[in-house]
């Protein structure tokens, strides 16, 4: 495979990786909807795994193949480049994920607080209703 076709293949994979990351983040954002959280989280996991594999297997490997095709003399040591690039991509993606998970956690906590308040209100109303009924029955017994 010549250098130009390697670069074209890398370009296609970068576009696919960006689209996959966008779909992954869209699924993560959609998971903020309490009712469809599990379904959207599984979509997010699938898309983020696909993104990681594209970056690691296609883009990084393609760049290494390209560099190797340009250096005919000796193989180039890519280990430090790969680790740095993987760390940067992982760090940036993880930062975005954590931000969304924090938002999701806040929404879940607010929803739980709301449900707890509604439950307490309902219990209070039922208690008041029972007290009124008891009071009315006492009044009827007095008469």
Swiss-Prot record:
Provide a GO biological process annotation: regulation of transcription by RNA polymerase II
Asked if Transcription is a keyword of the record, the answer is yes
- A cellular component term (GO) from this record? core mediator complex
Compositional bias of type Basic and acidic residues: which residue ranges? 111-136
Q: Indicate where this protein resides in the cell.
A: Nucleus
Ranges in a coiled coil: 97-143
Q: Where is this region: Disordered?
A: 109-143
GO terms for molecular function, please?
TFIIH-class transcription factor complex binding; transcription coregulator activity
Describe its assembly.
Component of the Mediator complex.
Which family would the database say this protein is a member of? Belongs to the Mediator complex subunit 11 family.
Q: What role is this protein assigned? A: Component of the Mediator complex, a coactivator involved in the regulated transcription of nearly all RNA polymerase II-dependent genes. Mediator functions as a bridge to convey information from gene-specific regulatory proteins to the basal RNA polymerase II transcription machinery. Mediator is recruited to promoters by direct interactions with regulatory proteins and serves as a scaffold for the assembly of a functional pre-initiation complex with RNA polymerase II and the general transcription factors.
| PANTHER family in alphabetical order | MEDIATOR OF RNA POLYMERASE II TRANSCRIPTION SUBUNIT 11 (PTHR22890)
Question: What is the designated name of this protein?
Answer: Putative mediator of RNA polymerase II transcription subunit 11
């Amino acid at each position: 495979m010549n250098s130009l076709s390697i670069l074209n293949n890398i370009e296609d994979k970068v576009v696919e990786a960006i689209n996959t990351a966008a779909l992954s983040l869209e699924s993560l954002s959609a998971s903020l909807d309490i009712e469809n959280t599990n379904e959207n989280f599984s979509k997010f996991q699938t898309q983020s795994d696909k993104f990681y594999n594209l970056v690691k297997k296609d883009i990084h490997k393609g760049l290494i193949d390209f560099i190797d095709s340009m250096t005919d003399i000796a193989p180039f040591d890519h280990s430090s480049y790969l680790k740095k690039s993987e760390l940067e991509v992982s760090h940036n993606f993880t930062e975005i994920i954590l931000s969304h998970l924090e938002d999701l956690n806040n929404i879940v906590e607010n929803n739980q607080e709301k449900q707890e308040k509604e439950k307490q209100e309902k219990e209070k109303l039922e208690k008041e209703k029972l007290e009124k009924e008891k009071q009315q029955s006492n009044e009827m017994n007095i008469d």
